[in-house]
Amino acid sequence: MNASCCLPSVQPTLPNGSEHLQAPFFSNQSSSAFCEQVFIKPEVFLSLGIVSLLENILVILAVVRNGNLHSPMYFFLCSLAVADMLVSVSNALETIMIAIVHSDYLTFEDQFIQHMDNIFDSMICISLVASICNLLAIAVDRYVTIFYALRYHSIMTVRKALTLIVAIWVCCGVCGVVFIVYSESKMVIVCLITMFFAMMLLMGTLYVHMFLFARLHVKRIAALPPADGVAPQQHSCMKGAVTITILLGVFIFCWAPFFLHLVLIITCPTNPYCICYTAHFNTYLVLIMCNSVIDPLIYAFRSLELRNTFREILCGCNGMNLG
């Protein structure tokens, strides 16, 4: 609960109002001896969860409503929006659960609290794996768009994209269950860290290759006479690649402190400086939730079509041409 996913809880204590229902293994309760923990009000988690939920629902509604957005990339963005919703909703519900546990009106057995903790931890784990897999799928989609432009519509069809999305979520569901079943093992943390860095390396390689190709292509186009359709098409492909690169950068920025937290738990659990860093776990959770809030803003900023659809849904502008 407001804890890192899938790791064992050792005691049913609550260090402060924004902490976990059960103190996770890596929350390092002794950290207060070395540095002061940052108190984050429960309202922050709840507010971020609600904003993220509304924003990502808007993204999904926009893609469903606008036929021009029925393409593999936007379907992958919808899947990423669901992953963003999952992590924010889990933390918001967790905050509500903490408030209920702290109230004098209801009491719960420790076993029930442990079950709820496992459910919310599983949701966070599933969201993490889903986010990484969807970002990778989008990277592959942009890669195919740039390097196999003439065959793109036969290689990456809507049906194939939807099948891949279903496969991603089935895999994520299995991972969530496995992480909970083996939550007592440190191998869970090792697997999460390994997956994160392996996926980041793979996506980084794809994007470096794409932008090197784009740079070479721009030089070649500049040396040729103007040809209608060539430059605009390439510009459109690269604009999509830039958008996903921004998404990836924000994802790394928001999730990196969490993964550094996991790395320190494995490598130096008793070092005072490591303990001090891990004392601020709730801050890293807030960053993760901020990622879920920022992503829809990036979609809107980078896509005029999506932005217009948002405006139509929110304002009811019937005169807008959505093609």
From Swiss-Prot:
Sequence intervals crossing the membrane: 38-63, 76-100, 119-140, 161-181, 187-210, 246-268, 278-301
Q: Name one Pfam family in it.
A: 7tm_1
Q: Which PROSITE patterns match?
A: G_PROTEIN_RECEP_F1_1, G_PROTEIN_RECEP_F1_2
Can you say where in the cell this protein is located?
Cell membrane
According to its UniProt record, in which tissues is this protein expressed? Answer: Brain, placental, and gut tissues.
Q: Which residues lie on this side of the membrane: Extracellular?
A: 1-37, 101-118, 182-186, 269-277
Q: List the disulfide bonds.
A: none
Gene3D superfamilies, A to Z:
Rhodopsin 7-helix transmembrane proteins
Which Gene Ontology terms cover its molecular function?
Answer: melanocortin receptor activity; melanocyte-stimulating hormone receptor activity; neuropeptide binding; peptide hormone binding
Spell out the family assignment given in the record's similarity comment: Belongs to the G-protein coupled receptor 1 family.
What name does the UniProt record give this protein?
A: Melanocortin receptor 3
Q: What organism is this sequence from?
A: Homo sapiens
